[in-house]
Amino acid sequence: MKLGPTGERDELIVKEIIRGNFPEFMRRLAPITVAQKGNTLIYNVMPDYLCIGNDQDYVRVPVSGPSAQRIADAFGMLLPTPRMSDQIYEAAKVRLAPKPLSGMANLNIGGKNYTNQQFMASKMSDTDSFNYHNQVIQEQLQGHQPGELVAGHKKDIVLSNDLQPGRLAIHGLHLKGGTPLQPGGISKHEANYKDYSHGVRLVDNNATLNGQNVQMSAILKDPKYAYLVNTDGVLKQVAYKYDGNDKPKTNVPESAVATNTPQTGRGQFLQRLNDYLSKINIG
C-alpha cells in the first residue's frame, strides 16, 4: 500500500502510541455520566487528546480517521460521536477557549514567519504546526494538572451517520456555552486528511448502564439506548475503515492501555519524527 508522506508520518505515530509511548496521565480515564429519560449511562474517556511523550514532556498528535481507528481498535476503545464530544466538553474540569492558528494574523512556525494566507495554503498539516499549536495549548493550561479532563482546544474525529465512505467527520472547538465552531460531524475532507486542529479522543468500550456492565459499541447499535450518546439514534457505522479491519477489535483487554512500555519525551520524539520525515521531504 502506498501511503504518501503524511501517511508515513501517521504510520510512525500509530506505532509509537500502540507501543505505549504516551503519558501516564492519559491512562487514567475520566467518567462521563449521562442521565436521561430514567436511564443513567457512565462511560469513560481519555482526559485529553492523543499525545506522545511522558507526563512532563508531550505533544498532541493529529492523525487521519483510519489511523485514529487503528489506535482505538488496538486498545479496545472507540471514537466519539458529536453528542459524546458535547458531553465531554460539558463534563470537562478545564474548558479551554479555542485558539485556531488560522485566526492568527502572523505566525512564526519552525523559525519562519507566515501570514494567515500562507499558513492556510501550505502549513495546516505540517509537523511544525502540530507542535506550535501544542505550545499554544500548553500556555493555556498553565496552572492546571495533567490528567484533568480538558476540552475545547481541538476538533474531535467523530463517528456520525452523516459520515460518507472515504470521508472524515469532525466536530468540536467548543465555544463558551458549549456551541462547537465545527458542528455536526460533516467534513469536506477525505478520511486520510489531518491538520493541527484535529484531535483523537478515545472512549473506553466498557461502560455501565443503570448499574449493569455494557459495551459502548452495543449501546450505539441499540434502538432503545443509542439516543443517550447519538443525536439521531442507532449509529450505522461504528468504525472508520482501514485495511484489515473488516472486523474491528472492540474487546482488547484493559491491560492494553496500562502498558509499562517506557515513554520518551516530546522533544526526543519530535527529533526522531523530523529526522524520519526529512528523508521523505516533508515537514
What does each model-identified segment do?
Residues 32, 37, 256, 268, ...:
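Cell-wall glycan-active module
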Residues 254-263:
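Acidic, proline-/serine-/threonine-rich low-complexity intrinsically disordered repeat tracts
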Residues 1-56, 60, 171-177, 191-207, ...:
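Short acidic-hydrophobic catalytic motif
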Residues 50-51, 85-87, 164, 207-209:
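Solvent-exposed loop/turn segments at secondary-structure junctions
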Residues 65-143, 202:
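Conserved hydrophobic ligand-interaction patch in extracellular adhesion modules
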Residues 262-283:
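Long, low-complexity, intrinsically disordered segments
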Residues 110-253:
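C-terminal, surface-exposed recognition/capping segments
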